């Protein structure tokens, strides 16, 4: 446990940790730095007056214990999450209610089912590629994140709702309302009391709720009308058909209960997939040998002409399952820059034991599996700070082979991320359709020249450190300024 003061609690230790870090670094990054002082991989920290005591866990065995205990999400996460989603969702539900809704959506997120929706994803990436072409023609530095966020919103709505928002080419009310809702939500990651308490948040969120739910209601009504005719393959249509077969299933009840689920798919999938795509571009630009291997793999699977990838995905989407090195790059990207973590509420009588046999009671604590610290824990990863996609392709007898349970980008077990297959599929499609046409290079040096300031600009050796941007997400700093050029 960090040094404790009766006057300031653990904030003295936090201040020492924060000193020398970028001012907008994520709380995850702050805790990563702090965790390096605790070799056991577990420690308590008291966040009074903003929160209670946290038990931070950064070992595979500790994370596995937490997973097996079936603990609930704490109010510090559940309340702001349900503010964004408009009610209980798969991320905040527990018990039998969670099981029912997870079972309804599992078929739509099954890998064999989703691969059939890959052409819809490819159609959205076509628009993204045209956006990149326009940027390449200008030859100017721009922030890539707004483009990737719009791509992920369009993709998620296409797959889950069979609805084309065209948000990549024009603002859509649903996406705009979601963005505002996320920006106004507070997950307790800011220590500024004015931002936390003195806001017009309730009024803004009420308005956003109305906009989002109105759109979702219209789309569910459309899906219901089309059930007797055109059979949509969207995730929501599949869930609706199964729901209406239940003895107490009604359309109005489904609409009321499903809106938070769709909003959580948008919220959770939008930021995380966008950030992972950005970091994949970033890391591949820094590691040209890995980029060359990815491009070679795409040549071998899709043929030598990048213009044909979209058509080939439409003809045989299962080609996307033949990209082991591309998948390794994405898993290594998620290891170095995981977009989220997992927090659960401790209970009396529930204890976690570290690798040395030390017991940590969880009563009165929020138990935080700090994914970024686990992924950078040198006790469980060879060359933990290095980008080595090959670690995902070696045998179990190789020194680089990942330790069991040490990679938790999507968590494990029954409550693992339901959207992980969709996210990985979208990322593979995006890389396959962009990397052989474009060179995408971070341009932080030029950005810092245009927008100079005296703040610290690096963390852990990266200018593209994970930055806070509302809603508790981890985004590449400054929206990933870059230059895009056509490959010769």
UniProtKB/Swiss-Prot annotation:
Disruption phenotype: Impairs the production of sterigmatocystin and leads to the accumulation of versicolorin A. Pathway: Mycotoxin biosynthesis; sterigmatocystin biosynthesis. Keywords: Heme, Iron, Metal-binding, Monooxygenase, Oxidoreductase. The keyword Metal-binding applies. CDD domains: CYP59-like. Induction: The genes forming the sterigmatocystin biosynthesis cluster are co-regulated and induced on oatmeal porridge or the fungal isolates were grown either on oatmeal porridge or in YEC medium (0.2% yeast extract, 5.0% corn steep liquor). Expression is positively regulated by the cluster-specific transcription factor aflR that binds the palindromic sequence 5'-TCG(N5)CGA-3'found in the promoter. Its cofactor is heme. One of its GO terms (molecular function) is heme binding. GO terms for biological process: positive regulation of sterigmatocystin biosynthetic process; sterigmatocystin biosynthetic process. InterPro entries: Cyt_P450, Cyt_P450_E_grp-I, Cyt_P450_sf, Cytochrome_P450_monoxygenase. Heme binds at residue 417. Its EC number is 1.14.-.-. Belongs to the cytochrome P450 family. PANTHER family: CYTOCHROME P450, CYTOCHROME P450 MONOOXYGENASE STCS. Cytochrome P450 monooxygenase; part of the gene cluster that mediates the biosynthesis of sterigmatocystin (ST), a polyketide-derived furanocoumarin which is part of the most toxic and carcinogenic compounds among the known mycotoxins. The first step in the biosynthesis of sterigmatocystin is the production of hexanoate by the fatty acid synthase (FAS) units stcJ and stcK. The polyketide backbone is assembled by the non-reducing polyketide synthase stcA by condensation of the starter hexanoyl-CoA and 7 malonyl-CoA extender units followed by cyclization and release of norsolorinic acid. This is Cytochrome P450 monooxygenase stcS. The lineage of its organism: Eukaryota, Fungi, Dikarya, Ascomycota, Pezizomycotina. The gene is stcS.
